[in-house]
């Protein structure tokens, strides 16, 4: 019996497309500098220290260069709480010239496209920085490289994994030559309407960096992601974030401008939605959005609908997005503004 070539071609096309989709999910990250002490567990060799003055005692803890709530210790009834969030990791230099200037090459952590370069240190706390867009699983993620001394790429350039894009430096607020480092983030984006939102709420604070302003980017735990990928190279970002604890939930009014589920369709829960439904967004303590589900609760403005129980002031635990204690918890003024960003201009 003679077989038609069409089914074979269709099957081949199906296999090829499936393979391409699977490959598009693969992160295949490389570290951005020669410093690979992260993988040997040598924190002091990998992370740049911070200068701390706590109750008159000065110290230089390397832990302050990690991701998360690692800075500004504060005494509370529940003990010492680190209240300042660090959205990325600070990587120490390995190479310096005789004057002490850092020489480390900074490289793209994965294939992508350069979408932003800030060449004026005073325009951002990041100093000179680069943002590269990566496409994984049909969604855009953004690697950010901060405190650079020089930049070798420009917006629109294709960046290949491991390609030199800059040189490490110490541009930005509060840094000096000794504490030179690369600040690395891997981010989700909140909204493509950020510039209009910023103009409405921060009129006296010029935005020089468009939608790539740090306020519009939610950084995940990139060091933990690197370590997780060493154990499971096929791990995807949705799978990685599925292990994060939900710390608070916010219900948003119905809006046609809600950009987050368009940017990250995987974040949508399976609940059935009708035309009158609001949206409930679940967040990690870091502020990274984890899940979006329809809600029957009718709201006219963003409303806190859940927060993990704690006796500590929530402003210390949530980057000042939630304020108050216990049953008195609510969105702070800044928290309400940030939630407005998600559905702006509604």
Pin down the residues of each PLM region.
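Conserved, short, structured surface segments that act as functional micro-motifs
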Residues: 123-133, 147, 157-233
